[in-house]
Amino acid sequence: AVAIDEVKRFIAQQDLNAETRFVPEKVIPKVDGEFEEKIAIIGGGPAGLSCAYYLAEKGYRPTVFEKEKQPGGMLMHGIPEFRLEKDVIEAEIDVLRALGVEFRCGVEVGRDVTIPELREQGYKGFYVAIGLQSGGRLGVPGEDAEGVKAGIELMREVNLEEKKSLSGRVVVIGGGNIGADVARTALRCGAEKVSLYCLEDYDSMPMGVEDRTECEEDGIEIHAGWGQTEILAENGRCSGIRFRKCLSVRNAEGRFAPTFDDNTTEEVPCDMVLYCIGQKVDWKGLLTGTAVELNPNGTAKADPVTYQTAEPDIFVGGDVYTGQKFAIDAIAAGKQGAVSLHRWVQDATLTIGRDKREFIELDKNNLLLEEASYDNTPRQRIGYNETLRKTFKDGRVAFTEEQVKAETARCLGCGASVVDPNKCIGCGICTTRCAFDAIHLHRDLPECSTMRSAEDKMKGILPYMIKRKIRIRRAKKAEKRNG
């Protein structure tokens, strides 16, 4: 596959240059100027910033309420700087300011001001995107010992420069991308030794291959296939952790149901345990005075297309609705949230003409593609500045322009088919034009339609077609005789 992340990084770096900085023009569909309706965005993370961007581009001046000292959410406070440099985020936020977005930082909705009070101030719509700010619980004895904390708390402390010093031996629990970030951050904060434990086996770890490789290159020990059973403590402080071997993580139905071998255990001495096994929403008093309903896991209930909650003027997006996902998912949700808010405050329909966002992943294991049929050029590799290893600076060396050209030339052009169901009239041309016979038409609700398939129609039409053909031929012969 093409190294799309590195190609995008190169393009983004060009966009950071002052002379090529892109600030979109506002598209204002009104003769008398911008929209005057006030919209409040609660949470300055990726979903909230995305929503603010698209609303501002459309002609609004939304207000973003952020409880921290600076906007950015998990992009700013949950991702280490050696992965995502803060000046990049700040540059993107500057674009929003240039578009007229107002930021009210240090204001926590639900504590400093409530949603009913904001309504009294004239706000007509609300977008709640506060993300998952709190770490879960380990659920084992001893987890209240000093030195045991959620990894996301460490990330927040380090990014806010409240803490950048650790010592001793650190155990990180969790094999996802956050676990990798926390482990590498702990090492950079001065930990003598960092070990990462997870339930999954080595090849099934949720973190990407690149994250795993970077952890190992930093000297982090990865122990796959282990589940914690107890935190060991001395005088109230963490002194170690006990694990047992994990045999399987999911059952036959694919549900999370780990099984263990109680006879195979391991006791690991350590001074700190950082767990990265999921996060949850901390609503506090945000929803006080509203009718917003919650799911059993604490996320908000909302329409899957419009993101509208049981409180009509409140919309949600990002992890607060979907649960833990990637930043790009939150950014996409923010765009759809902006569409819904625009329609809501303009008293328009929320549903007609919406992007249903159905994504069907390419089955890479079912490709009729012979390796000898294309130029199998090796993938471009990024360099690494070894002098920056184990520092908070990003040591990855971005692609040069020549590398970008070489990498994009590797694309096989499989393409992406975008289908808008709102515009499909069922003509069937796409099914006949597809060279790979990959498109087929199906009626979702046949009981609601009087349409008949072409095969069924031909059974009734064919006899009349033949009779008509015969009559036409006879008529032509009669004309010749009479002529």
Spell out what each predicted region is.
Residues 64, 68-99, 103, 158, ...:
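Rossmann-like dinucleotide-binding cores of NAD(P)H-dependent redox enzymes
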Residues 213, 219, 227-237, 249, ...:
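Mid-to-C-terminal Rossmann-like scaffold of FAD/NAD(P)H-dependent oxidoreductases
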Residues 37-63, 179-187:
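N-terminal Rossmann-like FAD-binding beta1-loop-alpha1 element of flavoenzymes
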Residues 11-33, 91-111, 135-189, 294-310:
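Glycine-rich dinucleotide-binding loop and its adjacent helix/turn
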Residues 33-40, 90-140, 230-242, 247-250, ...:
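Feature captures the FAD/FMN-dependent oxidoreductase FAD-binding
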Residues 1-12, 70, 100-103, 406-446:
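Iron-sulfur cluster-binding cysteine motifs and their immediate structural context
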Residues 146-167, 231, 251-324:
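FAD-site-proximal beta/loop scaffold in flavoenzymes
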Residues 317-345:
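A conserved FAD-binding loop/helix module that cradles the flavin
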